[in-house]
Protein backbone atom coordinates (compact mmCIF):
# COMPACT_ATOMS: atom_id res chain seq x y z
CA UNK A 1 0.00 0.00 0.00
CA UNK A 2 2.88 2.37 0.70
CA UNK A 3 4.34 1.88 -2.77
CA UNK A 4 1.03 2.41 -4.56
CA UNK A 5 0.26 5.41 -2.36
CA UNK A 6 3.47 7.00 -3.60
CA UNK A 7 2.56 6.14 -7.20
CA UNK A 8 -0.82 7.85 -6.83
CA UNK A 9 1.02 11.09 -6.07
CA UNK A 10 3.99 10.73 -8.40
CA UNK A 11 3.87 13.11 -11.38
CA UNK A 12 4.81 10.34 -13.82
CA UNK A 13 2.24 7.79 -12.67
CA UNK A 14 -0.65 9.61 -10.99
CA UNK A 15 -2.50 10.25 -14.25
CA UNK A 16 -2.25 6.68 -15.53
CA UNK A 17 -5.38 4.54 -15.37
CA UNK A 18 -3.35 1.46 -14.54
CA UNK A 19 -1.95 3.10 -11.39
CA UNK A 20 -5.43 3.55 -9.98
CA UNK A 21 -6.48 0.11 -11.14
CA UNK A 22 -3.59 -1.45 -9.21
CA UNK A 23 -4.53 0.62 -6.13
CA UNK A 24 -8.04 -0.82 -6.32
CA UNK A 25 -6.73 -4.29 -6.99
CA UNK A 26 -5.09 -4.34 -3.56
CA UNK A 27 -8.53 -3.96 -1.98
CA UNK A 28 -9.90 -6.55 -4.38
CA UNK A 29 -7.33 -9.13 -3.28
CA UNK A 30 -8.36 -8.51 0.33
CA UNK A 31 -11.98 -9.02 -0.73
CA UNK A 32 -11.07 -12.18 -2.62
CA UNK A 33 -9.17 -13.66 0.34
CA UNK A 34 -12.01 -12.88 2.74
CA UNK A 35 -14.56 -14.28 0.30
CA UNK A 36 -12.62 -17.55 0.02
CA UNK A 37 -12.30 -17.80 3.81
CA UNK A 38 -16.03 -17.21 4.19
CA UNK A 39 -16.83 -19.96 1.69
CA UNK A 40 -14.59 -22.30 3.69
CA UNK A 41 -16.51 -21.50 6.87
CA UNK A 42 -13.80 -19.42 8.48
CA UNK A 43 -14.50 -16.28 10.49
CA UNK A 44 -13.75 -13.07 8.64
CA UNK A 45 -13.67 -9.38 9.47
CA UNK A 46 -16.83 -8.25 7.67
CA UNK A 47 -16.06 -4.59 8.32
CA UNK A 48 -12.64 -4.89 6.66
CA UNK A 49 -14.28 -6.87 3.86
CA UNK A 50 -16.67 -4.02 3.14
CA UNK A 51 -13.99 -1.35 3.55
CA UNK A 52 -11.78 -3.04 0.97
CA UNK A 53 -14.66 -3.02 -1.52
CA UNK A 54 -15.45 0.66 -0.90
CA UNK A 55 -11.78 1.53 -1.34
CA UNK A 56 -11.36 -0.34 -4.59
CA UNK A 57 -14.60 1.01 -6.06
CA UNK A 58 -13.38 4.55 -5.44
CA UNK A 59 -10.00 3.82 -7.02
CA UNK A 60 -11.57 2.09 -10.02
CA UNK A 61 -13.93 4.98 -10.68
CA UNK A 62 -10.85 7.18 -10.99
CA UNK A 63 -9.08 4.55 -13.12
CA UNK A 64 -11.97 4.46 -15.58
CA UNK A 65 -12.13 8.25 -15.69
CA UNK A 66 -8.45 8.32 -16.70
CA UNK A 67 -8.93 5.48 -19.19
CA UNK A 68 -11.30 7.75 -21.11
CA UNK A 69 -8.61 10.40 -21.52
CA UNK A 70 -6.81 9.89 -24.85
CA UNK A 71 -3.07 9.86 -25.39
CA UNK A 72 -1.60 10.76 -28.76
CA UNK A 73 1.06 9.08 -30.82
CA UNK A 74 3.66 10.92 -32.91
CA UNK A 75 1.17 11.27 -35.76
CA UNK A 76 -1.39 12.86 -33.47
CA UNK A 77 -3.66 9.83 -33.49
CA UNK A 78 -5.70 9.38 -30.32
CA UNK A 79 -5.27 6.15 -28.36
CA UNK A 80 -7.46 4.97 -25.50
CA UNK A 81 -6.84 2.53 -22.68
CA UNK A 82 -9.22 -0.35 -23.44
CA UNK A 83 -7.46 -2.85 -21.19
CA UNK A 84 -8.24 -1.28 -17.81
CA UNK A 85 -12.05 -1.24 -18.21
CA UNK A 86 -12.00 -4.94 -19.14
CA UNK A 87 -10.10 -5.67 -15.93
CA UNK A 88 -12.48 -3.64 -13.77
CA UNK A 89 -15.86 -4.76 -15.12
CA UNK A 90 -15.95 -8.40 -13.93
CA UNK A 91 -14.69 -7.46 -10.49
CA UNK A 92 -17.32 -4.78 -9.97
CA UNK A 93 -19.98 -7.27 -11.09
CA UNK A 94 -18.59 -9.75 -8.57
CA UNK A 95 -18.88 -7.19 -5.78
CA UNK A 96 -22.51 -6.53 -6.61
CA UNK A 97 -23.52 -10.16 -6.94
CA UNK A 98 -21.82 -11.10 -3.65
CA UNK A 99 -23.66 -8.30 -1.75
CA UNK A 100 -20.50 -7.61 0.24
CA UNK A 101 -21.47 -4.04 1.04
CA UNK A 102 -24.86 -5.17 2.29
CA UNK A 103 -23.28 -7.58 4.78
CA UNK A 104 -20.79 -4.95 5.91
CA UNK A 105 -23.52 -2.30 6.06
CA UNK A 106 -25.66 -4.37 8.41
CA UNK A 107 -22.58 -4.93 10.56
CA UNK A 108 -22.01 -1.19 10.73
CA UNK A 109 -25.64 -0.62 11.67
CA UNK A 110 -25.49 -3.21 14.44
CA UNK A 111 -22.38 -1.41 15.70
CA UNK A 112 -24.49 1.77 16.03
CA UNK A 113 -23.00 3.45 12.97
CA UNK A 114 -26.01 4.12 10.71
CA UNK A 115 -24.06 6.72 8.73
CA UNK A 116 -21.47 4.16 7.58
CA UNK A 117 -24.28 1.65 6.99
CA UNK A 118 -25.92 4.18 4.66
CA UNK A 119 -22.66 4.79 2.80
CA UNK A 120 -22.21 1.07 2.19
CA UNK A 121 -25.79 0.38 1.15
CA UNK A 122 -25.92 3.34 -1.22
CA UNK A 123 -22.56 2.34 -2.71
CA UNK A 124 -24.05 -1.10 -3.42
CA UNK A 125 -27.21 0.13 -5.11
CA UNK A 126 -25.20 2.70 -7.09
CA UNK A 127 -22.95 0.10 -8.70
CA UNK A 128 -25.31 -0.25 -11.71
CA UNK A 129 -25.18 3.56 -12.02
CA UNK A 130 -21.38 3.76 -12.26
CA UNK A 131 -20.23 5.32 -15.51
CA UNK A 132 -18.29 2.21 -16.45
CA UNK A 133 -21.46 0.11 -16.13
CA UNK A 134 -23.50 2.65 -18.10
CA UNK A 135 -20.91 2.62 -20.87
CA UNK A 136 -21.04 -1.19 -21.04
CA UNK A 137 -24.80 -1.92 -20.98
CA UNK A 138 -24.30 -5.62 -21.70
CA UNK A 139 -22.41 -5.87 -18.40
CA UNK A 140 -24.87 -3.65 -16.54
CA UNK A 141 -27.65 -6.00 -17.65
CA UNK A 142 -26.07 -8.73 -15.53
CA UNK A 143 -26.78 -6.72 -12.36
CA UNK A 144 -30.28 -7.65 -11.23
CA UNK A 145 -32.66 -4.99 -9.96
CA UNK A 146 -35.22 -7.17 -8.26
CA UNK A 147 -37.17 -6.51 -5.06
CA UNK A 148 -33.96 -7.03 -3.06
CA UNK A 149 -32.42 -4.04 -4.84
CA UNK A 150 -35.31 -1.79 -3.86
CA UNK A 151 -35.35 -3.18 -0.33
CA UNK A 152 -31.70 -2.10 -0.11
CA UNK A 153 -32.73 1.39 -1.17
CA UNK A 154 -35.32 1.40 1.60
CA UNK A 155 -32.77 0.39 4.23
CA UNK A 156 -30.28 2.93 2.90
CA UNK A 157 -32.89 5.66 3.34
CA UNK A 158 -33.77 4.42 6.80
CA UNK A 159 -30.11 4.40 7.86
CA UNK A 160 -29.66 7.93 6.49
CA UNK A 161 -32.68 9.03 8.54
CA UNK A 162 -31.26 7.52 11.71
CA UNK A 163 -27.92 9.18 10.97
CA UNK A 164 -29.78 12.51 10.66
CA UNK A 165 -28.68 12.81 7.04
CA UNK A 166 -32.14 13.95 6.14
CA UNK A 167 -31.63 15.22 2.60
CA UNK A 168 -30.00 11.94 1.63
CA UNK A 169 -32.77 10.02 3.39
CA UNK A 170 -35.48 11.79 1.41
CA UNK A 171 -33.60 11.43 -1.89
CA UNK A 172 -33.00 7.72 -1.33
CA UNK A 173 -36.54 6.90 -0.20
CA UNK A 174 -38.04 8.94 -3.03
CA UNK A 175 -35.74 7.10 -5.41
CA UNK A 176 -37.13 3.80 -4.17
CA UNK A 177 -40.68 5.07 -4.61
CA UNK A 178 -39.94 6.34 -8.11
CA UNK A 179 -37.87 3.50 -9.54
CA UNK A 180 -39.67 0.37 -8.38
CA UNK A 181 -42.16 -1.08 -10.86
CA UNK A 182 -44.40 -3.05 -8.51
CA UNK A 183 -45.58 -1.26 -5.39
CA UNK A 184 -47.49 -4.28 -4.14
CA UNK A 185 -44.29 -6.34 -3.99
CA UNK A 186 -42.82 -3.73 -1.65
CA UNK A 187 -46.01 -2.64 0.09
CA UNK A 188 -44.52 -2.51 3.60
CA UNK A 189 -41.34 -0.73 2.48
CA UNK A 190 -43.26 1.85 0.43
CA UNK A 191 -45.53 2.69 3.37
CA UNK A 192 -42.61 2.91 5.81
CA UNK A 193 -40.58 4.97 3.34
CA UNK A 194 -43.33 7.56 3.07
CA UNK A 195 -43.71 7.58 6.85
CA UNK A 196 -39.99 8.40 7.22
CA UNK A 197 -40.32 11.13 4.61
CA UNK A 198 -43.40 12.45 6.43
CA UNK A 199 -41.52 12.54 9.73
CA UNK A 200 -38.58 14.43 8.21
CA UNK A 201 -40.84 17.09 6.70
CA UNK A 202 -42.75 17.44 9.98
CA UNK A 203 -39.47 17.96 11.84
CA UNK A 204 -38.49 20.56 9.22
CA UNK A 205 -41.85 22.31 9.55
CA UNK A 206 -42.92 21.61 5.97
CA UNK A 207 -46.48 20.37 6.46
CA UNK A 208 -47.36 20.62 2.76
CA UNK A 209 -44.71 18.11 1.71
CA UNK A 210 -45.45 16.01 4.78
CA UNK A 211 -49.08 15.61 3.73
CA UNK A 212 -48.01 14.87 0.14
CA UNK A 213 -45.82 11.99 1.33
CA UNK A 214 -48.69 10.35 3.22
CA UNK A 215 -51.05 10.94 0.30
CA UNK A 216 -48.72 8.87 -1.89
CA UNK A 217 -49.24 5.84 0.33
CA UNK A 218 -53.01 6.40 0.44
CA UNK A 219 -53.17 6.70 -3.35
CA UNK A 220 -51.21 3.47 -3.78
CA UNK A 221 -53.00 1.55 -1.05
CA UNK A 222 -56.44 3.17 -0.52
CA UNK A 223 -57.68 0.21 1.52
Predicted feature residues:
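Generic helix N-cap/helix-start motif at coil->alpha-helix transitions
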Residues: 96-101, 145-155, 185-195, 220-223
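Structural signature of tandem alpha-helical TPR/SEL1-like repeats
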Residues: 165-171, 204-213
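Short coil/linker segments at helix-helix boundaries
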Residues: 26-151
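Short coil turns that delineate tetratricopeptide repeat
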Residues: 12-14, 68, 129, 181, ...
Amino acid sequence: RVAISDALQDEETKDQANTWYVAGYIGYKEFDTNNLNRQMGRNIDVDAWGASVMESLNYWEKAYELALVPTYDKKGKAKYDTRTPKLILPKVTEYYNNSVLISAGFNAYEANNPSLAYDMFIAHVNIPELKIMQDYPEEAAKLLRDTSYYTCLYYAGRFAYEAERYEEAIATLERMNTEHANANALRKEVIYANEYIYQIYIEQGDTVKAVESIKKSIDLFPE
